[in-house]
């Protein structure tokens, strides 16, 4: 049993990128589907296909290099990190995104800032 399924998802994406795989499968959950949808919307992955028990993520490359150069889990099961709408960080001086779990659902940092909602800072991607 996994204690942190979101960290497992990010690690699978990181490892697949380093091995130059075209796609990666992760066990399915609603929050992981939301995170994958945000990654697709922001242009970090090619496509997301949801099957019965897993999510297939098609990875994106540019000139043979992974589009995602870094992933970081911020809020962990042992230490949760919450931010207000005015404290949402800019990742890599605006070149990356952060993903938050808010009362309005899972949102990218820019969406949360626009809606003026804070929440749990799940991860940073750049």
From Swiss-Prot:
Top-level taxon of origin: Bacteria
RNA-binding is among the record's keywords: yes
GO terms under biological process: translation
Transmembrane regions listed in the UniProt entry: none
GO cellular component: ribonucleoprotein complex; ribosome
InterPro entries for the chain: Ribosomal_uS8 (IPR000630), Ribosomal_uS8_CS (IPR047863), Ribosomal_uS8_sf (IPR035987)
Pfam families to which the protein is assigned, alphabetical: Ribosomal_S8
GO molecular function, one term: structural constituent of ribosome
Keyword annotations from UniProtKB, A to Z: Ribonucleoprotein, Ribosomal protein, RNA-binding, rRNA-binding
Functional note: One of the primary rRNA binding proteins, it binds directly to 16S rRNA central domain where it helps coordinate assembly of the platform of the 30S subunit.
Family the UniProt entry places it in: Belongs to the universal ribosomal protein uS8 family.
Subunit structure of this chain's protein: Part of the 30S ribosomal subunit. Contacts proteins S5 and S12.
Protein name stated in the entry: Small ribosomal subunit protein uS8
Species this protein is from: Nitratidesulfovibrio vulgaris (strain DSM 19637 / Miyazaki F) (Desulfovibrio vulgaris)
